[in-house]
Amino acid sequence: MAVSERRGLSGESPAQCRWEYLSLLVLMLSGCSGRIHRLTLTGEKRADIQLNSFGFYTNGSLEVELSLLRLSLQETEDKFPKVGFSLSRVRSGSVRSYSSRNSHECPLERNSSNFLVLFLINIKDLQVQVRKYGEQKLFISPGLLPEAPSQSGPPKPDPTGTPKDNHVIHPSPKKMSAVKEDQAKLTVPQVSGDKALPAGHRHSSDGQPQSQPPTRGPSGKEKDLVLGLGHLNDSYNFSFHIVIGSRAEEGQYSLNFHNCYNTIPGQEQPFDLTVMIREKNPEGFLSAAEIPLFKLYLIMSACFLAAGIFWVSVLCKNTYSVFKIHWLMAALAFTKSVSLLFHSINYYFINSQGHPIEGLAVMHYITHLLKGALLFITIALIGSGWAFVKYMLSDKEKKIFGIVIPLQVLANVAYIVIESREEGASDYGLWKEILFLVDLICCGAILFPVVWSIRHLQDASGTDGKVAVNLAKLKLFRHYYVMVICYIYFTRIIAILLRVAVPFQWQWLYQLLVESSTLAFFVLTGYKFQPAGDNPYLQLPQQEDEEDVQMEQVMTDSGFREGLSKVNKTASGRELL
């Protein structure tokens, strides 16, 4: 299970609960480091752990440091490696590649023609075997990249003068000298007392592994790279880095950890794992699909701010037709703008530093929570007709609000957990399913007040004699119902399909569709329910109009129509009956 901390919120005063909730946000963010991931698992029993997924461009780098791996005694005595990492290139928006395989099949024991790299941890020989499948030119080297590369330029020629093929693993052209310096530091004489190791697998005094370069077999073909595995007390450690060598290797990559000893149900053995993952593209720490999000969220924040300012100006010009719900709509637009602004700032710092600023991240989550609650409350209030034509909610409508508001709080908590936790955490998938289910329930619940209002207007249009006004309101509610359906359809279903269909570098179109659909929904809702005198939603039949309708019915029933005329109060001239 993932290392985490929990705080209770029961038995507190409302003010204390608010401070506890804010402290909970800070606590959850304390373990989040953006695109520099640190995952600690203790007593874990899963056989497959999806550590992370990232979109790489050319010269992008992946660094992995396994600082602690503690297995049971039975697992360390097995000669064939059944523990290790896998790096595979996956399709954008797809689930992990091993999700559809047999649960008893070990992905480390099968050969694959797909784009795949395996890191097999051999506990007995204290080494890590690197196996590559498919045509690829990934540069795999031991150790981590230096903080700042010492020099850049073309790769140095091989001193042996032998040709290289796809199985040769050499460092990135931009980090050649830095990697050689790191490897030179590892050539420390073996300390007495260590276990006898094969040639090329020496350990320094601190238990750090030393690797041997690829050697050539009898057939002249380069062998797989072998990394040294460090052994300190009862734990193991090693590190490596990968550089994307060409455009052919660009794509979405998924890094997974496998413990094939736990594939058989009922025979799982707990293990401990601590790993650091650092992913970087030439432009920063953001994935290929996330690089445009900083500018996208900043532009959309300005659009929502402009829409909110324009809406407030409309409210100030029509003071006599303004209701409380109109100001609630203005608050929603400004809250959405501020939330997107903080989201944009977070992506900026993640791209430049690898992690967000905790204070700004907390502000983003608070405004995101307020925005989500205001959105669903506003949609439900407009659909129920509150403040426009009535100031009391029915029992059914109160139950809807009693369901939607707590679910929105739960959905925002799930969103915060997903954003702050690592993908490899044991409860990450559970919170993701909770967010999807709760969001689906909320989207369905907000439709009920609109449907009830439509049925009420249908019944009232044939009984109270106010046919024209009720039919106009009925038409408006039907339009609003279609608008809500389209908003849910575009921001949930169409957006997910778009995310699966487009290439990895165009994944940001998903967020563009969601934010554009939200802005269009806000604008159309404001246009339909603007505080104007000719808005049928705000019109109530006047007493003189009711008398005219009653007089017209009397004259029609009595037959006194011939030669009579009525003065039209809204137009010059006369209108023949």
Curated annotation (Swiss-Prot):
Disulfide links within the chain: none
Compartment(s) where it occurs, according to its Swiss-Prot or TrEMBL record: Golgi apparatus, cis-Golgi network membrane; Golgi apparatus, trans-Golgi network membrane; Golgi apparatus membrane
Carbohydrate attachment residues: N59, N111, N233, N237
Region (Disordered): 144-224
Key words, A-Z: Glycoprotein, Golgi apparatus, Membrane, Signal, Transmembrane, Transmembrane helix
Biological process terms in GO annotation: negative regulation of toll-like receptor signaling pathway; regulation of immune response
GO cellular component assignments: cis-Golgi network membrane; Golgi apparatus; Golgi membrane; membrane; trans-Golgi network
Membrane topology of the entry: Multi-pass membrane protein
Family matches, as InterPro entries: GOST_TM, GPR107/GPR108-like
Signal sequence residues: 1-34
Chain segments annotated as transmembrane: 296-316, 325-345, 369-389, 400-420, 434-454, 482-502, 506-526
Biological function: May play a role in intracellular immune modulation by activating NF-kappaB response and attenuating Toll-like-receptor response.
Family stated for the protein in its record: Belongs to the LU7TM family.
Name of the protein: Protein GPR108
